[in-house]
Every structure is written in C-alpha cells, then in structure tokens.
Amino acid sequence: MTHQIAVLPGDGIGPEIVEQAERVLKALDLPLELRQAPVGGAAFDQFEHPLPPATLELAQGSHAVLFGAVGDWKYDTLPREFRPEQAILGLRKALGLFANLRPAILYPELASASSLKPEIVSGLDILIIRELTGDIYFGTPRGVRTAADGAFAGEREGYDTMRYAESEVRRIARIGFESARKRNKKLCSVDKANVLETSQFWRDLVIEVSRDYLDVELSHMYVDNAAMQLVRNPRQFDVIVTGNLFGDILSDEAAMLTGSIGMLPSASLNAAGQGLYEPSHGSAPDIAGQGIANPLATILSAAMLLRYSLNLAPQADRVEAAVRKVLADGLRTADIHEAGTTKVSTSQMGDAVLKALG
C-alpha cells in the first residue's frame, strides 16, 4: 500500500527545512508518494488565498500532511481571512484535527543550552497534549459590545465564551491516557477548576475516563501551578493533557526548557489517525534563504508522522536515533551552536542525518 503524503512547505524557512525532511523520508525506501502544494503566503501570491481549494483537497485526500511554516511581515496588512496563518486554522478545521501532541525532550548534548540548570532539566522528556477545537478560542458568542448593565454599563467591553462539550473532553482525555500508557503511565490533567466552571467540568470528565485506565496514575494541577512546576521541577511530568488555551501557553513554556524551539516537532491528529505534522517554530522570515535554519524539528515531525499516522514505529525510531547520533557527533546549526561543536548549514545537517540513517 502506498501512503500519500501532502507536503506543504509554506513561507520563510519552510521550504528549506521541509526539503530536508523529504530527503529523510525518501531515504527510508518506503511506499510513500510525496506531493507538494502551496500554502500560506506562497499560496496567496499565486491564488490570492492562503489555503487554495487544490491544496485543501490534496490534504484531505492524503494519509498525512507534512507542514513547514507560514507567515511573513509583508502580509500583516492583509484582511485577517487572507493572512498566511489562516491556512493552518483552515486545515485544522477541515481535517477535524482535535489533538495536538508536542514532545519536549532535552537531548543530553544540548543541556547547556537550556534556560534552566542542567541538574534541574537533565533527562527532560514530556509530552504535552493540547485540545484544539474547543475552549475560549472557538466559543461563541464573542465580540465587542456596549455593556447593558453592571458596574460598567454604557462602556464598550470585549467578551469571549469558554466552553467544552462532553465528547470533546472525553476524546482528548483518552488520547492522554493512551499516550501515558505507552510511556511511563503518568498523566497530569491541567485545568483551573478552582475558578472556572468549564475546568471543573473538564476535571470531572477526566476522572470518569480514568476508570478505564486504572494502570495509569492520574493527577490534577491548576494551570498557574503547572506553569511554575515546569520551571521548578519539570521532570515530575510524563504526559500533560489540557485545554486549548492552557495548552497553547504551557507547550511554548516547555519548549524553552529544551534549549531551542528549532528542536521541537508536533503532531495534530483527528479521530481517524490522519495528522498534520509541523515544527513548533515559525517561518522566521528574517533568516529565510540563508541556509542556516535548523531542520531537525521538521525531521522529527516526519518521524512522528511515521509513528502516528502510518504506524511505522521502527522507521520512526530509526529517524530519531539518527538525530541523536548527529547531535552526539557535535554537529549544530546556528541556533544551537556553542564552543566545541561544529556549525553546519541546513543542508549539511540533512546530509548528516541521512548518513546516520545508514
């Protein structure tokens, strides 16, 4: 069976880093069909829309999507619906992607690059699972209005709606428990149940789901404490499951513990296992075309693609082992370079990973 992969390089450094991930996938000699399409600003330049119908059709008809990055300052004056960033939102909605998986791993060779002391962060290996379709980002009603009553009657006010449906919480909780079961069997559910009705509802449902996973140790933590604990003692965590808003913030915080966001992959999955895989960093237009971008997050995203959407765990293991070997050999792109290591370009890093694959 041939697996079709939609390859959407995007803007900025996107094409450079995706090229290296494509090389790695092709080197594995698997039955893959990689098909490219424009997205983001690159698509707007050609079709006056960040997510053209042909690109969306390709993504919907593929087993998985390998995504680079979108965005550039030159598009900031466009109406919101035409900005490059709308492409990723459109893909999430069209593909029904509801679970975002963000690993935060500190490789031993990069311990000195972390913002925390090595004795605190050494051995860090966290998986943060963020719900993508609900919460305050998508709740309605929302907008700006004139307050009709209360202490601020007559003033303009902005308002949003935080909401979660029961089915949304149950399905993301199951992803959390299943992921923890495959790791160290520890799941921490993060909420704000002491203040928010939505969070108390979330917590109650996670507890209900936990009865199907008695082999997994479940704990709960308020989001403010979780943010503190990620800095104070990050190794206490194995898998974290949380809502859209809290996950957006905590996953970026965890990213900075690893030394460089250029090392962090991510996966967004739907109920059928179809996924969109992308590096956690942005399009970095300021360094685009210079050949200095770090492709490892994208290569590791390709490994996640193999693992989660194609069920090819052995091949994913090979790619991840190759990345570890390259780091152990002292090769570094500019973002993680330090004294005593060898600085390499984007393509040279890709060459090194291919060599390590054997």
Swiss-Prot record:
Binds 1 Mg(2+) or Mn(2+) ion per subunit. NAD(+) binds at G282, S283, A284, P285, D286, I287, A288, G289, Q290, G291, I292, A293, N294. It is found in: Cytoplasm. It comes from the Bacteria. SMART domains: Iso_dh. Mg(2+) binds at D224, D248, D252. One of its GO terms (cellular component) is cytosol. Gene3D superfamilies: Isopropylmalate Dehydrogenase. The record marks Y137, K192 as: Important for catalysis. One of its GO terms (molecular function) is NAD binding. Pathway: Amino-acid biosynthesis; L-leucine biosynthesis; L-leucine from 3-methyl-2-oxobutanoate: step 3/4. Substrate binds at R92, R102, R130, D224. Its EC number is 1.1.1.85. GO terms for biological process: L-leucine biosynthetic process. Pfam families: Iso_dh. It is an enzyme of class 1 (oxidoreductase). Keywords: Amino-acid biosynthesis, Branched-chain amino acid biosynthesis, Cytoplasm, Leucine biosynthesis, Magnesium, Manganese, Metal-binding, NAD, Oxidoreductase. It catalyses: (2R,3S)-3-isopropylmalate + NAD(+) = 4-methyl-2-oxopentanoate + CO2 + NADH. Its cofactor is Mg(2+); Mn(2+). Homodimer. Belongs to the isocitrate and isopropylmalate dehydrogenases family. LeuB type 1 subfamily. PANTHER family: 3-ISOPROPYLMALATE DEHYDROGENASE. Catalyzes the oxidation of 3-carboxy-2-hydroxy-4-methylpentanoate (3-isopropylmalate) to 3-carboxy-4-methyl-2-oxopentanoate. The product decarboxylates to 4-methyl-2 oxopentanoate. This is 3-isopropylmalate dehydrogenase. It comes from Bordetella pertussis (strain Tohama I / ATCC BAA-589 / NCTC 13251). The gene is leuB.
